[in-house]
Regions:
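A short, conserved structural fragment
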Residues: 347-357
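Minor-groove-contacting beta-hairpin "wing" of winged helix-turn-helix DNA-binding domains
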Residues: 358-362
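Basic/polar N-terminal segments that are highly enriched at the extreme N-terminus
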Residues: 1-4
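Local cysteine-cluster metal-coordination motifs and their immediate loop/turn environment
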Residues: 16-27
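Short amphipathic alpha-helical interaction segments
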Residues: 332-345
């Protein structure tokens, strides 16, 4: 049917390049020369050409992540987006985000992004204190960040996210509060505030670091929402805060289990009850990207039990929680019949709360969210 509503599909595109790998980073990324970057975008072009056009779907969001997707020549990003618009039905109001690091942006680059439909910028600041940026091994300064932020505003970006990191080595509670107020004072539309996680195999994983103690980390997290509220932000997910209507639609799609297709090196997908990812081997990806079946790995067909568990533990990441009605509509089962004991236990001990149709994590529950969510695995 011509007027029938198309089912939503999100796109994630992985650009694995950066200027220098940060000391805490365990993402699939690294520096590369111009030739390797061009070679990669050609491989990406072949993958996009080879996947189905999903004519029954509407692309509601596109997220270009990395790495640092603002490192390559902007014309490569622009050409890729043109190909995507020619291949898929991209909704006129689609949210199109690119991640960028301070110091990798200039006016013409931002202009090219806007001309090709990018309407949301996610800036990886991490901290407005140069001392903390140095500890993290970041290559930009707070001054360079401000220059990039105001340049993006002048270019016409009206939807900007800023990434912040707490529990940085040697960081005090006062440092964190100052960081929040400094960044909120810039009035971005969205702030993502993550706690530093020390990953094995990274330079941080091998060092003896002076990290904030548990009580300090607890206070940092617990007070973030209240501080940001003073500046007009509301918390809508465990680590995300937005001004009215500026929640990240792409990430909300992940938590609401909207299908997404991952393109590029190591990119993950959720498609028609299947989860899979592309190879993380660059040589293999470049050689076989024209044959999507050859680069796909970790194919997992989700059972109904898997999907119900995902509905619960992904949905509970959002402050609005999960809807019992939506669960019944999707699975044809009553949530209380499936998870009655788990719900009863966590409602009684105050980890979950219920308001009308919705069940959500309490403030207390958010701090032990992984433990609560694990109980929904049948």
């Amino acid at each position: 049917m011509e007027n029938e509503a198309k089912k939503p599909l999100e796109l994630y595109i992985h650009i694995p390049f950066c200027v220098k790998k940060c000391d805490y980073c365990d993402f699939l990324s690294g520096p590369a020369g111009k030739e390797r970057q061009r070679e990669y975008f050609l491989a990406l072009e072949r993958e996009i050409a080879a996947v189905p056009d999903f004519s029954d779907r509407e692309i509601t969001t596109v997220f270009i992540g990395g790495g640092t997707p603002s490192v390559p020549d902007p014309s490569l990003v622009g050409e890729m987006l043109d190909q995507i618009r020619n291949k898929f039905f991209v909704a006129p109001d689609a949210e199109i985000t690119i991640e960028a690091n301070p110091g990798t942006l200039y006016k013409e680059k931002l202009q090219i992004y806007l001309e090709h439909g990018i309407n949301r910028l996610s800036l990886g600041l991490q901290s407005p204190q140069n001392r903390e940026l140095k500890i993290l091994g970041r290559i930009h300064t707070w001054e360079e960040f401000q220059e990039s932020f105001f340049m993006a505003r002048d270019a016409g970006f009206s939807n900007i996210n800023i990434d912040l990191m707490s529990a940085i080595p040697e960081q005090t509670y006062a440092d964190w509060e100052k960081n929040l107020r400094t960044v909120a004072g810039l009035s971005p539309e969205h702030i993502s505030a993550y706690s530093l996680i020390i990953e094995e195999g990274t330079p941080f994983g091998e060092r003896k670091l002076k990290l904030p103690d548990e009580d300090t980390e607890y206070r940092m997290y617990e007070n973030t929402a209240g501080i940001l509220e003073e500046y007009g932000f509301h918390q809508y997910e465990i680590s995300n805060y937005a001004k009215g209507g500026r929640e990240c639609r792409h990430n909300k799609g992940y938590w609401q289990r909207i299908d997404y297709l991952g393109l590029g090196l190591g990119a993950s997908s959720l498609l028609d009850h299947m989860r899979f990812s592309n190879t993380a081997d660059m040589k293999e990806y470049i050689g076989n990207s024209a044959f999507p079946d050859k680069i796909r790995q970790n194919m997992e067909s989700l059972t109904e039990a898997d999907e119900m568990a995902e509905f619960m533990f992904l949905g509970l990441r959002m402050t609005e929680g999960v809807s019992m009605e939506a669960f019944a509509e999707y699975f044809g089962k009553n949530m209380e019949n499936v998870y009655g004991e788990v719900l009863k236990k966590h409602l009684e001990i105050g980890m979950l709360e219920q308001k009308g149709d919705r069940i959500y994590l309490s403030r207390k529950g958010i701090h032990v969210s992984n433990g609560v969510m694990a109980d929904f695995l049948l």
